[in-house]
């Protein structure tokens, strides 16, 4: 018994054309033979979906099917269709973006591969916050694929030439299947090149490129942030087909600092101050990330975890002459291990301030 066409596409009767197209598109992408080579079950599902789509997308055929079911097409050429299967290729006109690569043997992919640059490479380097502040120069060692010095990317030994592929006769593509169900794919022997290397270059083993280890200088600019990347043009792998090199992307990882915490252009640090400094205020000296000594004023009566902003003492802003701020967060230290004189002073201060033994929690 033949399956219901709506059921094959996962639709209910009365589905719109857009719904039919979307349902077929989803199945076709998943089960197309070019993506499931050698998988007979996938080919069968794709064939069923195509038959269902061919009927349900056509208003006349759909009307007949809705009224009479499969019997409306008994005796026809395509699985019993009265109209035959004259327009198989027309089915895919609305899906050119998907099926162009399937039905042209991935010509677009072959063309892109031959004209694309070589692969990009990635490299991670860890630096200190001071390195990020001042900028940093360092040599890094990389391994990449460069053009073979012997064959210059031609892949054959000197004095020899590639041979025409005998599987695809130089087209780079082969046709699979028969009758209406034919799919063109990339030749598995020459990988779409249309030619094979009968006498491969001994230096690169017919690949057209060789592995090379080299040392290059990396210039890290002042103000760079964590996880930012530096692009080094042409320092990736080579594509031997066109001798174009990819790029190297160096990712910057900044180590945590024991004093300063970074947030973009600004730096944060704890500022430990005494009880008296907090109460009376005081001018103090501190060192910045640049090891520069500066003076700051602690305001009278400052509370714990309040901020003091030092403008221009933060990180350099990348590719500018501007700087962020240094934000100091106060941490008031409670005195411990007091001697007798200090104890008397605090007792007198407590009396002067009229510290009682009752605390109102609402006055925090």
UniProtKB/Swiss-Prot annotation:
A Gene Ontology cellular-component term: cytoplasm
Annotated CXXCXGXG motif repeat ranges: 148-155, 165-172, 187-194, 201-208
Annotated organism of origin: Borrelia garinii subsp. bavariensis (strain ATCC BAA-2496 / DSM 23469 / PBi) (Borreliella bavariensis)
Chain's role: Participates actively in the response to hyperosmotic and heat shock by preventing the aggregation of stress-denatured proteins and by disaggregating proteins, also in an autonomous, DnaK-independent fashion. Unfolded proteins bind initially to DnaJ; upon interaction with the DnaJ-bound protein, DnaK hydrolyzes its bound ATP, resulting in the formation of a stable complex. GrpE releases ADP from DnaK; ATP binding to DnaK triggers the release of the substrate protein, thus completing the reaction cycle.
SUPFAM superfamilies given in the database record: Chaperone J-domain, DnaJ/Hsp40 cysteine-rich domain, HSP40/DnaJ peptide-binding domain
Zn finger spans (CR-type): 135-213
PANTHER family reported for this sequence: CHAPERONE PROTEIN DNAJ, DNAJ HOMOLOG 1, MITOCHONDRIAL-RELATED
Family, as annotated: Belongs to the DnaJ family.
Domain characteristics, as noted in the entry: The J domain is necessary and sufficient to stimulate DnaK ATPase activity. Zinc center 1 plays an important role in the autonomous, DnaK-independent chaperone activity of DnaJ. Zinc center 2 is essential for interaction with DnaK and for DnaJ activity.
Gene name as annotated: dnaJ
Superkingdom, taxonomy of origin: Bacteria
Pfam families on file: DnaJ, DnaJ_C, DnaJ_CXXCXGXG
Subunit structure comment from the entry: Homodimer.
Protein name: Chaperone protein DnaJ
Binding, Zn(2+) 2: 165, 168, 187, 190
Subcellular location: Cytoplasm
């Amino acid at each position: 018994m033949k399956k219901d066409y709506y059921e094959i596409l996962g639709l209910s009767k009365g589905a719109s054309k857009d719904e039919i197209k979307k349902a077929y598109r989803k199945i076709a992408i998943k089960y197309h033979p070019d993506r499931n080579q050698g998988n007979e079950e996938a080919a069968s599902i794709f064939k069923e979906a195509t038959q269902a789509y061919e009927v349900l997308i056509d208003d006349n055929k759909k009307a007949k099917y809705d009224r009479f079911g499969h019997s409306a097409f008994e005796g026809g050429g395509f699985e019993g269709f009265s109209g035959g299967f004259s327009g198989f290729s027309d089915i895919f006109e609305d899906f050119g973006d998907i099926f162009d690569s399937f039905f042209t043997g991935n010509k677009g992919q072959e063309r892109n591969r031959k004209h694309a640059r070589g692969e990009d490479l990635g490299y991670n380097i860890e630096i200190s916050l001071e390195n990020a502040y001042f900028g940093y120069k360092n040599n890094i060692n990389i391994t990449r694929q460069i053009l073979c010095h012997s064959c210059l990317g031609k892949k054959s030994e000197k004095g020899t030439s590639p041979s025409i592929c005998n599987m695809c006769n130089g087209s780079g593509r082969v046709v699979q299947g028969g009758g209406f169900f034919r799919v063109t794919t990339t030749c598995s022997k020459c990988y779409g090149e249309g030619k094979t290397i009968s006498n491969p270059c001994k230096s690169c083993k017919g690949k057209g490129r060789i592995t090379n280890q080299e040392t290059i200088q990396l210039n890290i600019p002042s103000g760079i942030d964590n996880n930012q990347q530096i692009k080094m043009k042409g320092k990736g792998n080579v594509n031997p087909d066109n001798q174009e090199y990819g790029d190297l992307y160096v990712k910057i990882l900044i180590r945590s600092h024991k004093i300063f915490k970074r947030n973009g252009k600004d730096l944060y640090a704890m500022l430990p101050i005494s009880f008296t400094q907090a109460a009376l205020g005081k001018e103090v000296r501190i060192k910045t990330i640049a090891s520069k000594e500066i003076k700051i004023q602690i305001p009278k009566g400052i509370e714990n975890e309040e901020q003091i902003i030092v403008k221009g003492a933060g990180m350099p802003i990348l590719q500018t002459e501007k700087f962020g701020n240094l934000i100091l967060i106060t941490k008031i230290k409670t005195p411990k291990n007091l001697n007798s004189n200090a104890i008397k002073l605090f007792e007198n201060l407590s009396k002067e301030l009229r510290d009682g033994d009752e605390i109102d929690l609402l006055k925090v």
